[in-house]
Amino acid sequence: MDKKDMLYNKVMMLVAVMLPVCLCFAVPTETMAKKPKKLVILHTNDTHSTILPVSEHLPDTMKAGRGGFVRRVAMIKEERKRNPDLLYFDSGDFSQGSAYYTMFKGDVEIGLMNLMGLDAVTIGNHEFDSGLENMARLFRMANFPIVCANYDFTGTVCEDVVKPYVVLHRNGLKIGVFGLSPKMKGLVADKNCEGVKYLDPIATARKTAEVLKKKEKCDVVICVSHMGWADGKEYDANVIQGSRYIDLVLGGHTHTYMKHLEYVKDLDGHDVPVDQNGKHAIYVGRIVMNLK
């Protein structure tokens, strides 16, 4: 798709009882047929085992008593009634952060995520916290694909449960989705990632996005990323600057709450939108891509 034909609308959804408070935005996308087509995308990141809403006693009254996996399940069911063809992605670190993970090692989180109809999830550093065997066990429990293009799991127990990308179909469109995850050194104990090779995320993104656009003939390419939003060598902005063919980056890792979409120019000078939704499932991002 030609980016000049893309229009994106962003909505932030505050997870309350059922459906939230919204903020709106807009962005660009491409067209395939004479009739305009629309993609509705929900996305989350860094829930950190927040099963129940956060404390009602938080000083920030906009967040107090909100968020959590349980309320998100109900909210997404309501959203699907309005948009049955929506896409839903998670950018990792759904693990670690509450007694539920300490006691059950991720079973509760995966069980609830299985109720949400996720289309793809990437790997955060905290998914490694109970070791590779446990991570592989959880990924096999999942009824959604785990995508990560820059971790090489060859020869490990996760080799057959992680894909570099998936190709999805909605409204007559092909959507390519690939995952990127951060360098493990300094974030993951060596014993918990033994045998896993970290691949350069910029080179990987460039190669994978090209495969999705040129070989798989995808109309839209989405990167579900746990690289983070910050200044440095290996963050979402650097990935975009060193690649082409990516239409949208859904981020995580740095717990950044973006009130609006951020834009970074790719190798061809196109503006690529990036979004991230803080932490603890308080917010769910909603992006509408109108392809005209």
Predicted regions and their residues:
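Alpha-helical transmembrane segments of integral membrane proteins
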Residues: K10-M13, K37
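Bacterial N-terminal signal peptides
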Residues: L14-C24
